[in-house]
Regions:
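Bacterial signal peptide processing site
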Residues: 18-21
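Residue-level hotspots at or immediately adjacent to binding/recognition sites across diverse folds
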Residues: 26-141
């Protein structure tokens, strides 16, 4: 009985995945992960910081890499790094954050407030609307 269930499960998985791949192809030939939803991915490539919307690359000017992305009220917020500074972008406009040798690791939006969590040379911090709030007293915290 267990062998029978195994073979049935394997067949359903094999044929089910093949069917999904052909049914979920959009007009660009892409196979979306979540049908009928917009997929945002933050990262970088050889040209620098960027994000992708459903596979289409959007450049983040002046950035080295992007670490997180969130969409709020139609605006795209992305955290990352530019040179030795943490930064974030609203859509494609870059905002540098105070503190040297830092990186913005995560971003959140609450109403009109933009929060970026990250670190800088002296330890962990977060920035609220561009103002740095230290979370540590030394580099090891």
């Amino acid at each position: 009985m267990n062998k029978f269930l195994f073979h049935i499960s394997l067949a359903l998985l094999f044929f089910g995945c093949d069917l999904l791949e052909t049914q979920n192809t959009n007009e660009n030939g892409n196979n979306p992960i979540i049908p009928n939803h917009t997929i945002y991915i933050a990262g970088n490539d050889e040209q620098g910081a960027c994000y992708w919307i459903n596979g289409t690359r959007i450049e983040l000017p002046g950035g080295d890499w992007a670490t997180d992305i969130v969409v709020s009220n139609g605006n795209v917020y992305t955290s990352g790094t530019c040179g030795e500074h943490a930064c974030y972008w609203i859509n494609q406009e870059r905002f540098d954050l105070p503190g040297t040798w830092g990186e913005g690791e995560a971003i959140a939006v609450d109403g009109d407030d933009v929060y970026v969590a990250g670190w800088f040379d002296n330890g962990s911090c977060y920035w609220k609307n561009g103002s740095k709030i230290n979370l540590t007293t030394n580099r090891d915290s």
